[in-house]
């Protein structure tokens, strides 16, 4: 309480200072000459602290206003927020004396008076909240009102606002460019109509408070708690005339330091932020035109509106008649006012959330207007030109119809609703401005100009209300999580529907699913991104769609040509014993031909690998082993009769060159797959015809152990004997017999054959078994199948065959050297191991690091030896070295690790070798043999980091055990054998010599220096360094006595002695039992 009294006394004495008192009194005298012709001004938002002579002393400070001294010292808050309860009680207790007084939650601007208008009657104080809860009496309003003086608005503004109490702060909001003629909305205008002071000395104020005429129940709404928009026009001083030089000089003479402070406060608090409700209420109850906002934001100070022109635009433009003029006060204006004062009206309709208001709708070309006519027209009727669509107009008039104050005429409503139709139909207006306005309506939705958006704000919350920038709407995001898993989508996230619905939708657009699929398949893979357009389902549906595509005629022609060639070849070789019906020319065969001709494409490039799919392997599982022979180059050509003795039966070579062939078979044949019984009989007949020439067959490789039963030496011996004993006549006879048996087996069956197809189009996609077919002319065993193709074919007949790294070589050429010759050993590369069965597992260490780029097929088609079969074979073959593998597995050493630096590799080399290479005598020339060195040697991890940083060579074991209370060290014994370069289980030769000389010298008293040479001592050091077990080589002891009777002991140990564990800490003494 004492501090409050002291601050009150200081502030009172501060306000009654001579300089400030004299300055304020001069300003008061000058302001007393003000008339009612001044421009549009606003009441201050904060109570004044000026010490006027005409104001009674009790009214210097409001009850709720803090002293300027405390505000300047920042000892309290700058702004006080009143609660709703106090505000409601204050509003309820405020006396009202006006006859037309009603409370309202909206703001109403009255008509500007004429020049000859008399002074307005005294009005009651405003009913709007402010930053303080103070209230003044009517006597204060009247006494302060009589002090006005007719002066220039700009000069009077500079004089009167300097005396206002100021609060230090910064400008937090500013709009527009920093120009001289720009209009700026300034926050917290002290000349605010929401202030409870009677009259302000600033020119920016109303002479009368702004009072609405709305319902009484809306006084406590949130919109009533916010002040109105205050707009400052900086260019008023340039438009005024007859400036009083004497008054200007008097204001410049008496300049106080507090004037700048008061002016800063006045500039920082000349406007306040509104909520959305306040903006709507302003539009409902006011008479201002939208050009008010246009003048504030556009920066054009000379913008005026021709009221005569707007009065003639009722027929062609959207003109809304506003008859809700319920104001009781008048707007002050000077002789030559700014365009804000000339504003005819403000529209009374509700603003939408974000209406697009163009500058062309708000502004018009400047023109000279008769002031009396414009004022009379403003008093009678106010017209507003706004651009609204039909929905907004309906909303506007629906709100007006629901109002209790008045009702809108039906004709006016009909006029506003038909506004768009009239503007579009009536292209010719009364003047040029109407035409421009109608043309601009079409582009209203497409312009990128600024938009006004109004946001909701809480009570006394400083948030931005007007956004004059446009904000584009963000594009809607599509998330994959919102899609269902069972639906199919392509790369562009287009749903692939079922066949029926998809066809219906595509036929409407003039497309079909077949066209899309064929266009997709026809595109070759040219870039990396094209790989993602391929799918495994393309080839599966290719056979179904090719019968209906645009290439049907070409397929029929190709089909007919191959069918006729097959007929001619068949009839020429067999003399017409079989008719054309045996070829099975049916519609199903034609479809099968089309499928096989299109699906199974030759693999000639790397891009062709992506045309393959796993469905091909599933379909080709039905083909048997004999069918693979029949459709490969091993199958003899039917075209070649007894006269043509050259057979196409060949084997695979080790080079990746073209196929060496003599004859080109023009006849192709296939089997009907749906007849399993006939297929079994047919395949058995073919096997007998192919392998029954010599009368003995070799078993087929069906498991892991069958691979090792193949002996390369036997095939070498047969090749030697067969090459020397047979001649060309024998080859011809053997080939002719094979052809006759094959032909008889082909047509003894009752199965219908498929239509002729490409000779190799139906080759197996799954790996076939390795079949050993002995022959006199053939030197090696023949490996058939594997679906991979890693080379380009120049031959047309072999273009679609899928080959292994082996190549076909015609075995009928007896003059060609066999594999034992040195020519082929230099040219031929070593092939990989033959693949076992399909259902066997894959070991990660069986893959080479370069296989990722070399393997053309998916990883699911790579087949490797099963570990279970390998272990079973090792058990049968009595290879028991599992301890070695177990230790390596524990240490994290891979199985293909090469122990080339130890004796272990030399001792176990014969046991670790693959049995494939041990069974053949001619290992270098075997078609299944690799290089002479093993895979472990060529692909070892020697010199590289191993898994889990495993040991790459033998390292000593840890000889210490650290327990909780002691550390135990163990030493090596004599019988502990290790693998190293010198076999440390026994002494080295140098150590043996050293020990012998030592014992001899001790017994004979001979100095060791005369016995050993320096070179020998150096060699002892080298032997010690070569010891991998870190056993220090014992050197000769240094003698102490001349007779060498005593030798100095050395603190070292060797492997020759077994020592007990040594406890290196005295913990054993502590753990021993203590005496009492």
Swiss-Prot record:
Q: Where is the composition biased (Polar residues)?
A: 23-34, 107-117, 193-206, 214-223, 362-378, 690-701, 739-748
> Residues bearing Phosphoserine?
275, 354, 403, 407, 632, 676
| Any one GO CC term of the record | mitochondrion
Q: Where is the composition biased (Low complexity)?
A: 93-106
Q: Where is this region: Disordered?
A: 1-66, 85-162, 190-223, 234-253, 357-450, 534-557, 566-585, 658-701, 713-762, 909-931, 1000-1020, 1042-1076
Q: Any idea where this protein resides? A: Cytoplasm; Bud; Bud neck; Bud tip
**Compositional bias (Pro residues) spans?**
118-128
- What induces it, per record? Repressed by zinc.
Q: What are the GO BP annotations of this UniProt entry?
A: fungal-type cell wall organization
Record field: compositional bias (Basic residues): 1-11
Alphabetic keyword roster: Cytoplasm, Phosphoprotein, Zinc
Q: Where is the composition biased (Acidic residues)?
A: 419-450
Segments of skewed composition (Basic and acidic residues): 408-418, 576-585
**Which domain of life does this protein belong to?**
Eukaryota
Primary place of residence?
Answer: cytoplasm
Q: What cystine linkages occur within this chain?
A: none
The UniProt subunit note reads as follows: Interacts with BUD27, GIS1 and SSD1.
Q: Which family does it belong to?
A: Belongs to the ZRG8 family.
Q: What does this protein do?
A: Involved in the integrity functions of RAM, a conserved signaling network that regulates maintenance of polarized growth and daughter-cell-specific transcription.
Record-given protein name: Zinc-regulated protein 8
- Organism for this UniProt entry: Saccharomyces cerevisiae (strain ATCC 204508 / S288c) (Baker's yeast)
Gene label:
ZRG8
């Amino acid at each position: 309480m004492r501090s409050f009294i002291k601050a009150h006394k200081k502030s009172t004495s501060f306000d009654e200072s001579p300089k400030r008192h004299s300055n304020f009194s001069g300003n008061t005298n000058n302001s007393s000459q003000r008339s009612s012709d001044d421009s549009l001004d606003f009441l201050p938002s904060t109570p004044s602290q000026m010490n006027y002579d005409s104001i009674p002393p009790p009214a210097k400070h409001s009850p709720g206003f803090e002293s300027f001294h405390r505000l300047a010292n920042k000892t309290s808050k700058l702004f006080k927020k009143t609660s709703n309860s106090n505000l409601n009680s204050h509003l309820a207790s405020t006396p009202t004396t006006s006859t037309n007084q009603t409370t309202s939650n909206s703001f109403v601007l009255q008509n500007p008076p004429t020049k000859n208008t008399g002074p307005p009657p005294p009005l009651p104080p405003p009913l709007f909240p402010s930053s303080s809860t103070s209230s003044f009496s009517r006597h204060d309003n009247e006494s302060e009102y009589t002090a006005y003086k007719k002066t220039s608005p700009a000069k009077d503004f500079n004089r009167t606002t300097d005396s206002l109490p100021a609060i230090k702060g910064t400008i937090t909001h500013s709009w527009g460019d920093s120009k001289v003629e720009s209009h700026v909305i300034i926050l917290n205008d002290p000349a605010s109509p929401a202030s409870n002071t009677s009259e302000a000395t600033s020119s920016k104020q109303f002479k009368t408070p702004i009072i609405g005429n709305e319902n009484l129940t809306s006084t406590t709404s949130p919109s009533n708690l916010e002040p109105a928009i205050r707009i400052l026009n900086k260019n008023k001083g340039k438009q005024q005339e007859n400036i009083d030089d004497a008054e200007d000089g008097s204001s410049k003479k008496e300049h106080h330091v507090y004037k700048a402070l008061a002016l800063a406060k006045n500039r920082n608090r000349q406007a306040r932020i509104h909520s959305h409700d306040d903006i709507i209420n302003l539009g409902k109850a006011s008479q201002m035109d939208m050009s008010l906002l246009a003048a504030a934001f556009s920066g054009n100070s000379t913008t005026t509106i021709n009221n005569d022109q707007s009065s003639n635009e009722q027929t062609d433009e959207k003109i809304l008649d506003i008859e809700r003029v319920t104001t009781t006060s008048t707007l002050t204006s000077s002789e030559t006012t700014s365009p804000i004062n000339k504003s005819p009206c403000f529209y009374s309709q509700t603003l939408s959330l974000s209406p697009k208001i163009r500058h062309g709708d708000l502004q018009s070309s400047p023109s000279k207007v008769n002031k009396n006519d414009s004022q009379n027209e403003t008093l009678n009727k106010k017209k507003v030109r706004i651009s609204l669509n039909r929905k907004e107009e309906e909303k506007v008039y629906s709100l007006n119809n629901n109002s209790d104050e008045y009702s809108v005429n039906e004709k006016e409503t009909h006029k506003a609703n038909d506004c768009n139709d009239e503007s579009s139909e009536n292209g010719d207006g009364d003047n040029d401005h109407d035409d421009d306005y109608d043309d601009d309506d079409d582009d209203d939705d497409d312009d990128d100009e600024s938009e006004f958006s109004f946001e909701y704000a809480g009570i006394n919350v400083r948030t931005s209300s007007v956004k004059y920038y446009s904000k584009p709407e963000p594009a809607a995001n599509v998330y994959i999580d919102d899609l269902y898993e069972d639906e199919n989508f392509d790369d562009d996230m287009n749903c692939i529907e079922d066949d029926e619905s998809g066809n219906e939708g595509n036929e409407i657009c003039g497309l079909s699913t077949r066209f899309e699929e064929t266009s997709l398949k026809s595109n070759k893979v040219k870039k990396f991104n094209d790989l993602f357009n391929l799918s495994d389902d393309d080839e599966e549906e290719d056979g179904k769609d090719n019968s209906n595509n645009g290439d049907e005629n070409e397929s029929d022609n190709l089909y007919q040509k191959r069918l006729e060639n097959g007929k001619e070849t068949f009839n020429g070789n067999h003399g017409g014993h079989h008719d054309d019906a045996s070829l099975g020319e049916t519609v199903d065969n034609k479809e099968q031909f089309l499928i096989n001709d299109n699906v199974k494409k030759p693999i000639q490039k790397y891009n062709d690998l992506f045309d393959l799919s796993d469905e091909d392997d599933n379909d080709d599982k039905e083909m048997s082993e004999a069918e693979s022979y029949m459709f490969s180059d091993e199958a003899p050509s039917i075209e070649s009769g007894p006269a043509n003795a050259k057979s196409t039966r060949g084997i695979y070579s080790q080079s990746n060159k073209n196929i060496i062939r003599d004859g080109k078979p023009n006849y192709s044949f296939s089997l009907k797959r749906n007849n399993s019984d006939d297929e079994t009989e047919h395949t058995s007949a073919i096997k007998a015809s192919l392998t029954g020439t010599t009368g003995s067959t070799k078993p087929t490789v069906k498991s892991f152990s069958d691979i090792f039963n193949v002996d390369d030496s036997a095939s070498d011996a047969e090749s030697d004997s067969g090459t020397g004993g047979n001649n060309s006549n024998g080859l011809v006879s053997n080939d002719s017999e094979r052809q006759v048996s094959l032909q008889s087996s082909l047509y003894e069956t009752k199965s219908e054959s498929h239509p002729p197809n490409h000779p190799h189009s139906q080759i197996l996609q799954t790996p076939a078994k390795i079949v050993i077919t002995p022959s006199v002319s053939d030197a090696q065993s023949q490996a058939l199948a594997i679906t991979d193709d890693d080379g380009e074919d120049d031959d047309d007949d072999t273009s679609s065959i899928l080959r292994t790294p082996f190549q076909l070589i015609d075995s009928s050429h007896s003059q060609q050297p066999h594999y034992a010759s040195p020519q082929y050993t230099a040219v031929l590369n070593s092939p990989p191991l033959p693949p076992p069965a399909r259902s066997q597992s894959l070991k990660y260490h069986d893959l080479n690091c370069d296989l990722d780029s070399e393997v053309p097929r998916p990883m699911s088609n790579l087949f490797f030896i099963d570990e279970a079969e390998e272990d079973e074979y090792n058990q049968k073959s009595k290879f028991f070295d599992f301890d070695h593998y177990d230790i390596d597995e524990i240490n994290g050493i891979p199985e293909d690790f090469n122990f080339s630096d130890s004796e272990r590799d030399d001792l176990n080399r014969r046991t670790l070798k693959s049995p494939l290479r041990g069974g053949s005598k001619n290992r270098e020339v075997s078609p299944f043999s690799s290089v002479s060195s093993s895979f472990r040697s060529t692909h070892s991890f020697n010199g590289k980091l191993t898994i889990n940083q495993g040991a790459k060579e033998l390292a000593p074991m840890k000889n210490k055990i650290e327990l909780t209370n002691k550390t135990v060290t163990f030493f090596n014994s004599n019988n502990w054998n290790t693998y190293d370069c010198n076999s440390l289980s026994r002494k080295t030769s140098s150590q043996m010599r050293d020990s012998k000389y030592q014992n001899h010298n001790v017994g004979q008293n001979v100095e060791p220096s005369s016995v050993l040479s320096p070179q020998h001592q150096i060699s002892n050091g080298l032997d010690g360094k070569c010891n991998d077990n870190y056993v220090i080589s014992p050197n000769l002891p240094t003698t102490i006595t001349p007779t060498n009777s005593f030798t100095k002991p050395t603190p070292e140990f060797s492997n020759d002695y077994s020592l007990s564990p040594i406890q290196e800490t005295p913990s054993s003494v502590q753990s021993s039992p203590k005496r009492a």
